[in-house]
Amino acid sequence: MVFVASGVAVVTGAGSGIGRALAQQLAAAGSALAIADVDEAGLAETAASLRGNVEISTHVLDVSDEAAVRAFADDVVARHRRVTLVVNNAGVALLGQFEEISLDDFRWLMNINFWGVVYGVKYFLPVLKQQPRAHIVNVSSVFGLVAPVGQSAYSASKFAVRGFTEVLRHELEGSNVFVSCVHPGGIRTAIAQRARLGANAPARSREEAVARFDRLTPNSAEEAAARILQGVERREPRILIGRDARQIDVLQRLRPATYWKALAKRVQEPTRKP
């Protein structure tokens, strides 16, 4: 990984899941790192797990706070002097159908999942443009390709990330900054367990969602991170992670108005007890 090994990478949401796996693989490849997460304990665990003789800085950060992201970018540049890769990975989930969640719930998720990405690009782009080669990776989701029941806020945020990233790629085409949008399929992380329960969603929604998530997550965070870094080295504009994501992408293209009929049974069927 020639590009990655010679650079300075910023990874948000690095306290667990894909973000932690990315930090570990980047450090092992020789990349300097600035890792951030709102979870201070998780961030410390990630930092302690990193291997490699590389410069590392840790930053407790709420990506929904614009002023905090601006200060974060300034701090990273002051410490590392340059940035070549930014991975906007931080994200949260919300359980409940649209009528079961409050507008405050909806805004909370959008502020993290969408505006956190926008802020990350806005305040790191100037330093990225100063490098001979640089890369922005924005993490969307397979739910930025299709829109399942019970994911109104999450899908809205991930479709927004997808659209924003595609526009950004077109606007930066021909420059030194390449842009990739990542669409992970089912990844084994703690996002479902940590999801916020909608204001009016029944308590059983969490148990059902976690059981469904466990059944539909064939890919590991480590596999996801490796695929993302492969896509960065290859300068891929769209990075689909997992066979499930590739299948859903094809299905949506073939049946854009009726794909949910094909997906609903698989996604919504109850977990079978042994």
Question: Predicted regions span which residues?
Answer:
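Substrate-binding pocket helix/loop in short-chain dehydrogenase/reductase
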Residues: 97-98, 102-107
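Active-site helix of classical SDR
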Residues: 121, 157
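Residue(s) in the substrate-gating loop at a strand-loop-helix junction
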Residues: 141
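Conserved glycine-rich cofactor-binding loop
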Residues: 8, 15-16
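The beta1-alpha1 cofactor-binding region of Rossmann-like NAD(H)/NADP(H)-dependent oxidoreductases
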Residues: 40-41, 60-71, 103
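Active-site loop immediately N-terminal to the catalytic Tyr-X3-Lys motif
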Residues: 99, 146-153
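SDR active-site lid
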Residues: 174-243
